[in-house]
A protein has these predicted regions:
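Membrane-interface transmembrane helices that cradle and orient dolichyl/undecaprenyl
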Residues: 1-12, 254-261
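Transmembrane alpha-helix segments characteristic
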Residues: 11-23, 213-228
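Helix-loop-helix junctions and helix-breaking kinks within/between transmembrane helices
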Residues: 14-52, 67-76, 187-188, 234
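Membrane-interface catalytic loops of GT-C/OST-like multi-pass glycosylation enzymes that act
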Residues: 25-35, 172-177, 230-243
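A membrane-periplasm/extracellular boundary helix in multi-pass inner-membrane enzymes
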Residues: 26-27, 47-120, 133-141, 149
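Transmembrane alpha-helices of multi-pass inner-membrane enzymes
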Residues: 40-41, 197, 218-230, 234-261
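Hydrophobic transmembrane alpha-helices and their immediate junctions
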Residues: 41, 45, 50-51, 162, ...
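Long extracytoplasmic/lumenal interhelical loops at the membrane interface
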Residues: 107, 112-141, 145-186
Length: 261
């Protein structure tokens, strides 16, 4: 019975993680998919007892995604007309039936987010490249105190020096990276406080009296959430800040958890 429960637990784990990965893939959120895959890889490396379910998840997800991309019409009923690094720079011609009772094929032009490869190849002229360049200039001009919290968009729209940095795009609401955000709007003072906060948080998780596997999972979650090389939302704006600090609270609780044997 114990062996059967053991197998069932691993099957449930694998199916649950696979479902999450497939939903993330279907959502089209590339950064979410990348960070989820990063989490799976780190957990596979360090959680020895869970490697089987994680490995099954990776293999099963890769197989299902491959089949979906090959078979589902959504990924096959279009042709690429133009692909650039600019915002909405991927232009495709989408084909579909004109109506249900006819085999006549119609088409329409759709503008989508640029491909990841194009953005990397031409990063300086991409939306992220211009936003990060503008943020860096704000930090260099105000290295100690920054431009002031929540002033990024205002200065971009009303200050000629900064507005001219945005050549191909409208001003963004925030710098789209947590660390760059604090540097641009808070300078070294706020950035230093934020780094100190992260160090205290990690120390709290590591030094808790919970089981090591729960502490490690909590640490991995924090590491992925605050991974420096990725685009993010703003911690001081609406849903992103709420969900981030809620997850931090869950990690702090999880790191104190002990299994009942």
């Amino acid at each position: 019975i114990s062996k059967k429960k053991f197998k069932n637990r691993y099957i449930i784990h694998a199916l649950y993680l696979t479902l999450i990965l497939l939903v993330t893939f279907a959502s089209g959120e590339r950064m979410s998919l990348a960070t989820f895959c990063m989490g799976l890889i780190l957990l596979f490396i360090f959680l020895k007892k869970n490697r089987l379910s994680i490995l099954v998840t990776i293999i099963l997800s890769a197989l299902l995604i491959y089949l979906i991309v090959k078979i589902h019409p959504f990924y096959n009923d279009y042709r690429i007309i133009e692909s650039t690094e600019y915002h909405q720079g991927l232009k495709v011609q989408k084909f579909y039936k004109c109506n249900e009772s006819s085999d006549e094929i119609c088409s329409k032009i759709i503008e989508l987010q640029p491909s990841f490869v194009k953005v990397i190849q031409n990063f300086s002229s991409s939306a992220y490249g211009e936003i990060y360049s503008l943020s860096y200039k704000m930090f260099i001009n105000n290295p100690i105190t920054g431009t002031g919290i929540n002033n990024f968009n205002y200065l971009c729209n009303h200050n000629t020096i900064y507005k001219n940095e945005m050549n191909n795009y409208e001003c963004a609401s925030h710098p789209h990276n947590i660390y760059i955000h604090w540097l641009a709007e808070g300078g070294l003072i706020v950035f230093g406080i934020f780094i100190l906060y992260l160090l205290i948080l990690v120390r709290f998780i590591i030094n808790n009296d919970g089981e090591n596997k729960y502490k490690f999972i909590s640490f991995i979650i924090i590491l992925i959430m605050f991974w420096p090389i990725m685009s993010t939302g703003s911690l001081i704006k609406n849903w992103y800040g709420i969900t981030t600090f809620f997850i931090i609270g869950l990690c702090m609780c999880l790191s104190r958890l002990k299994s009942n044997h």
